[in-house]
A protein has these predicted regions:
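Beta->alpha turn/N-cap motifs
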Residues: 15, 31-37, 54, 83, ...
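Short, hydrophobic alpha-helical packing/hinge segments within bilobed ligand-binding/sensory domains
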Residues: 18-19, 27, 38, 73, ...
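Ligand-binding "clamshell"
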Residues: 39-50, 183-186
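Structural transition elements
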Residues: 96-129, 146-149
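Ligand/substrate-recognition segments at binding pockets and active sites
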Residues: 128-196
Length: 197
């Protein structure tokens, strides 16, 4: 039997609004607590727990568009991003570098055969071998605050590889309906959370 008579869900995307609702007592449970807010919540008497999950941010490449149709180019971009630095700076160390959509604790997890860990020299070589230079990339992201916090370093890492990066953000519903889930997509790369809700 249920231990609570009713549950009321509030969808608060803005981290500041979520934090204010938690500290103000208008919510009893908060999912996806921003790393930067954990100490403040603990100070307000909240019990904050962290567990491995499935909310990995991911890059989605438009493989119908050159040069993203080349696996070497996609690997180069992924290897150019210093993921551990992202975890330490943007996520305050509250994550582990993912190698799959499944966390390693999942019984179905398999270690991938392709190493996509940070290696700027290998990334440069992959781009060179693919015959790509001076690439301009349009990076489209959702407007989730924690996803947006990843953009400056990703942009910097890709620019250090010699790419020019333009960034646009939009709501998940608009991004999927108007950018990715269309007959002839024109985007280059999308950065989104594992759960776009």
């Amino acid at each position: 039997p249920a231990k609570v008579a009713t549950l009321k869900w509030q969808s608060l995307k803005d981290d500041s609004a979520r934090l204010a609702a938690a500290i103000g007592g208008t919510v009893d449970v908060m999912e996806a607590v921003p790393a930067s807010a954990q100490d403040q919540l603990k100070g307000a008497g909240w019990n904050v727990e962290s567990k491995p999950g499935y909310g990995n941010p991911f890059l989605m490449f438009n493989t119908q568009k050159a040069p993203f149709d080349k696996p070497e180019v996609r690997r180069a971009i992924l290897k150019a991003i210093d993921k551990q630095k992202l975890i330490n700076s943007s996520l305050e160390g509250q994550a582990v570098e993912a190698t799959s959509f499944l966390p390693e604790a999942n019984p179905a997890y398999k270690k991938p055969s392709t190493d996509l860990s940070y290696d700027k020299d290998a990334a440069s070589k992959l781009l060179s071998d693919a015959g790509v230079s001076g690439l301009e990339v349009n990076l489209v992201t959702t407007d989730h605050p924690w996803v947006l916090s990843l953009v400056p370093q990703i942009k910097s890492d890709l620019e250090a590889l010699g790419l020019k990066v333009n960034h646009t953000q939009m709501a998940s519903s608009d991004l999927y309906a108007n950018v990715t889930d269309v007959d002839n997509p024109t985007y280059d790369i999308v950065l989104a959370p594992g759960d776009p809700s």
